[in-house]
Amino acid sequence: EIADGRTGGFDAADYVAWFREISKRTAEMIVHWQRVGFVHGVMNTDNMSIHGLTIDYGPYGWLEDYNPGWTPNTTDREYKRYRFGAQPHIGQWNCTQLANAIYPLVGEVEPLQEALETYVDVFNTDWRRMMGTKLGIAELDGERDSELIHDLLELLPKIETDMTLFFRGLANVSTDDGLDLDARVAPLLGAYYDPDTFTGEVRAETDAWLDRYIARLREEGRVDADRARAMNAVNPLFVLRNYVAQLAIDEADTGDPSLILELLDTLRTPYTEQPGRERFAEKRPEWARVRPGCSMLSCSS
């Protein structure tokens, strides 16, 4: 396509255009990883696709509590190179290695460096827009919204907070100015692994952040129900929780595949509430915190 249908005779400009498209697709893919809390686990260059597709995810997992330093890969436990928070940087690093590999086909560094900037530009733009949609903000407002996003991501790890359930709960936060603080924060309480820790400084910081957030939502003037629908369309209710996957594997090992099939069917519509399947959206139970297969995996798991 880049070469107008030609099957041969590609020149340096064609290879640069090809590389630019790969950088763009890689950035777009990783934005979606960050949106749903997916951790690939082993982002070696040979585990990346030039099509911007998620492949070769062996020791992968989803964030349970929001922890940018988490990786499910036991072999990466010490250095955490491929941790959730590092995935955007690793994506750029991997694209850089591809640029080094195709340099002999291009013969100049500058065009490849310029094409590599596509990754940074696309990721930054799409990530910021993505976070806006997760918060239900239709039109982002420069530095002010960047600070709102930054402060939330700094706040979430202060106590164990289920990422998936927090953003679903945030959709139910009301902009009604007649609510007291307890009623306002109530939709978020189910996301905390130990609600008793939601006190003191963390509670005060959360209340202060909600003040700013609700004020921002009121500026846009959207009806709460419309905003909630938009947020729930980008914030999944169901993800492949590590402990649920292990339970399904355990049952399949006994010859009963029914849980795997039900889980698979549930995940086909991850943004939709599904009566009778609420257990697939529950926080990680305490027993799964350190159980192999639920908290950590190896490449041979």
Label each residue range with its predicted role.
Residues E28, W93-T96, N100, L165, ...:
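Generic structural signal for well-ordered, non-membrane alpha-helices
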Residues V109-N235, N242:
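Helix-loop elements that line ligand-binding/catalytic pockets
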Residues A191-S301:
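C-terminal amphipathic alpha-helical interaction region
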Residues T26-W33, P59-G61, T125-K134, L155-L165, ...:
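Short, charged low-complexity intrinsically disordered segments located at boundaries
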